[in-house]
Amino acid sequence: MSHTFHCPQPLLVMIALTIFRYATLAIALIVGFVILKAIYNVFFHPLRNFPGPLRYRASRIFWVLDLIEGRQIYTIDQFHKRYGPVVRTAPDELSFTIPEAWRDIYGHRVGLVSGLPEIPKWPLFYKFTKQDVSIFNAPQGQHGTLRRALAHGFSEKSTRAQESIIGGYVDLLVTRLKEVADSKAPANMVQWYNYTTFDIVGDLVFGNSFHCLDNANYHPWVSLFADSTRQNSIFVGLKILGLDFLALATMPLVIRNMIKHFNLTKEWLRERRKLGTDRGDLIEGLLKKEGEGINFDEIHGTSMGLIFAGSETTATLLSGVTYLLLQNPKTLAKVTMEVRSSFKSDKEITLLSVQNLDYMLACLDEAFRLYPPVGIGLPRQIPKGGVKIAGIYVPEGSIVDVPQYAIHRSPDHWTEPESFHPERFLGDSRFASDKVETLQPFAVGPRNCIGRNLAYAEMRLILARVLYNFDLKMDPSCSGWLDGQKSHALWVKPPLKVQLTPTKATS
């Protein structure tokens, strides 16, 4: 005999009402807390006297939304144009477009009350997990150990010794571009630059190319990275809001992709180990020090970071300078003439000889100014005791940064800041008032970009070889290529279609 339990209707109603009351109370408490927190942030917070838009001073959520939507660089640029060189961009964050702030935020610090040799990176922005340790987010002491181990591989001497590797991939790029030119189809230069830089850094880190140039396509590992930039912004944004558990619950595909990245990188790193520690590449120094203050996880995390930082940023700058030259035909003609008049053959274009192309180097600097590969501010957190930034006292716990996109386009520092004028870096009197020291595309201080020498070497050699071998004409569909691009730390670049015509000397 079976018995069926029937819940009386009044009891169901009572349960529902109780749940509703508690839910309403919870929502009311949350809303009340948010309102009180906003009132505190606007009227009582230690940063209350700094200018900025009201809603950004009241809540961090608007900063996070801009980050997730990829529009943060434009928003902060507009804030500085409206409010001045120091802007409160979140309840606890200040953005500086004062040249001295570069040194004060990112430089070496001696004799501080805190005793720290640098202002620490903001951990919520840089570390995905507690286990995620690399040269890019390591604490000060361990960062120094990792950087010293890497230093030789990134020195100018080592970069020149790696020229046969770098030059081989640039040779292959030119060959593949000639094939595209023969087909009469436009070349998507964003892809071709990415193929080249990923292949180069893959070889210099893992001892093996990604074969992007060979296959005229991205390796699946590279595609995983390229497809994850917005998801990474979402993850970081939720983490900053204290909601990283939501990212773990709602972004399983991203988590799976991260695991794939980790596992595949470990596999390649183990294969690289088999090549020994005398290859003269970027991670030779790390492998030599494994077990002597550096562990495998740190080598693994650093290797992943080197692949990203050593490929995407260089390819981005090359894409940007190509577009800016195409948009300025007189400048393109002048730099092309400089390159072609300096060399009698392709083989004369080397890492050493391209250093004499003053106008081309100025074009690269001007592209860095208008289209910095990392245009956002890289946040630091003020230590105990507070710090003076550009003569302004900032209390402990505050987040501070210098946004490259905004400071590079500030009319306070640059004549005609929105226009492409390489001459500003060559002593032209029209730009005598420009503060060229404001341009710091590789940052400053103990955590500046260790790959500066390699990046400059690659972009100089690649641009010179492209200009020497091809006449360039932009596809009309790409005339607004730069306008409104989204940025998730790195730019989300649309195709840059360029019609290539081999020059008579090389065809």
Swiss-Prot record:
Keywords: Heme, Iron, Membrane, Metal-binding, Monooxygenase, Oxidoreductase, Transmembrane, Transmembrane helix. The chain crosses the membrane at residues 24-44. Pathway: Secondary metabolite biosynthesis. Its EC number is 1.14.-.-. It is found in: Membrane. Its main location: membrane. This is Cytochrome P450 monooxygenase tpeC. It comes from Talaromyces stipitatus (strain ATCC 10500 / CBS 375.48 / QM 6759 / NRRL 1006) (Penicillium stipitatum). The lineage of its organism: Eukaryota, Fungi, Dikarya, Ascomycota, Pezizomycotina. The gene is tpeC.
